[in-house]
Structures are given as structure tokens and as C-alpha cells.
């Protein structure tokens, strides 16, 4: 009976810890939320991206930023090919624009290994003055991440590898 009770307690702790969306930075032993929600001045961000990053943005549409932090253990492994990656990004963009026509911007911090899988089919821009990293990511996002920003400046940032369907759900949540 005691063994069953202890197993039940252990199992419930595992379920609770697995359902909490957090990311652990092993180097500093800090825990960061995988998602952050907030509000920012959209016109300032648009201005920085337009002027420093030479990125065309329609301020009346949501802004979707796909972020590549540089090579890490997560994004340098796996079995995706250039072709499968291209198909994945195209489906993601189609789904985004089906929900709401949007500005979709691809931004990188460090291009190491970026153009091995992504070259030739997306226009990746360097993070101008590290504004995306400093504003949205307090630590290195493993694999990458995304930021969804409404025309009014409400945002959701996601720190880590993501599924395009989850991104679509968050975009619907943001614009509704």
C-alpha cells in the first residue's frame, strides 16, 4: 500500500513538472518560461527592422518573426533535409496567411550552419543590433523560436523548437 502511494505521488510530480512549460538553462541553473506574453510599442520595433534590417513591414498586419539563434545541439541534429525544411516553412507560411495575412520575417543571430538547410528559399536577415534577442529572449532559445506581434503591439514569444500548428493556434489567440 505504501509503495503504491509513493508511486502515485512520484507519478503526479512527474506529470506536474512535465506540464509546466519551462526551459532550464543548465549553465546558470535558471528556469525560464518557454512562452512570454506582453505588450510593446510596435511602431518602434517596425522602425528598427525597416531601417536597420532593411525589412519591409506593413504595420497594419501581424508580424511573425522566425528566429534562428545559431548552431546548437538541437538545431544541428535531426533528419530533416533541405527539401523537407522548405516544405515545412512553406506550409507554415500558408497556414499563417490563411489565419491572417501577416508579415513573416526570418531573423538570425549567428548564421553558422543556417544556410546548410535553409539556403535559397527564405530571406534570412541578421538581427539588427540584436534587438530581437534583447527584447524577446533572455537566454539562448534551443533550436530557435518565434515571436508573434499583433498590429497593436501585443506579443507572444516562444523560446524553443516549435510545431507550426502550435504557432497557428497562438496566432489565432493573439488576433482574436
Give residue spans per PLM region:
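Solvent-exposed loop/turn segments at secondary-structure junctions
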Residues: 13, 70-73, 111-114, 154-155
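Generic short beta-strand
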Residues: 145-146
